[in-house]
From Swiss-Prot:
Residues 111-113 form a propeptide. The keyword Metal-binding applies. Residues 1-65 form the HMA domain. Belongs to the HIPP family. The modification Cysteine methyl ester is found at residue 110. InterPro entries: HIPP, HMA_dom, HMA_dom_sf. The lineage of its organism: Eukaryota, Viridiplantae, Streptophyta, Embryophyta, Tracheophyta. Probable heavy-metal-binding protein. It comes from Arabidopsis thaliana. This is Heavy metal-associated isoprenylated plant protein 15. The keyword Translocase does not apply.
Length: 113
């Protein structure tokens, strides 16, 4: 979910993240200072979150709410990890140079006895 806070400085960002850190169900949060928004991921009640932020900060508006699905997030993270692993393996692969070795000392040419 995305909550508009109207916060554009580091000091206020610290206060807001500290105030929401005690709420149960928050898996991760990110504060975008350019847009002044707070992005929260987890199984937290949006009404409870906005009420808590308004009580402590004064202004908060819920702009986007998408229900959090932990299984879906886990699948996305697993797919990303597999993709990164494949890319890492591709970096370590290289084309081996095939060399033909000739030994002139033991020629099997025409021998007349």
């Amino acid at each position: 979910m995305i909550v508009w806070m109207g916060v554009y400085d580091q000091r206020s960002k610290g206060k807001i993240t500290k105030s929401i850190s005690d709420l149960p169900g928050i898996h991760s949060s990110y504060m975008d200072l350019k847009e002044g928004t707070l992005v929260v991921m987890g199984d937290v009640d949006p009404v409870e979150l906005v009420r808590n932020l308004r009580k402590k900060w004064g202004k908060a508006k819920l702009t986007l709410y998408v229900p959090y699905d932990a299984l879906k997030e886990a699948k996305i993270a697993e797919a990303k990890q597999k993709r990164e692993e494949i890319e890492r393996e591709a970096l370590y692969r290289y084309n081996r140079e095939i060399r033909d070795i000739f030994n002139d000392k033991e020629e099997q040419g025409c021998v007349i006895c």
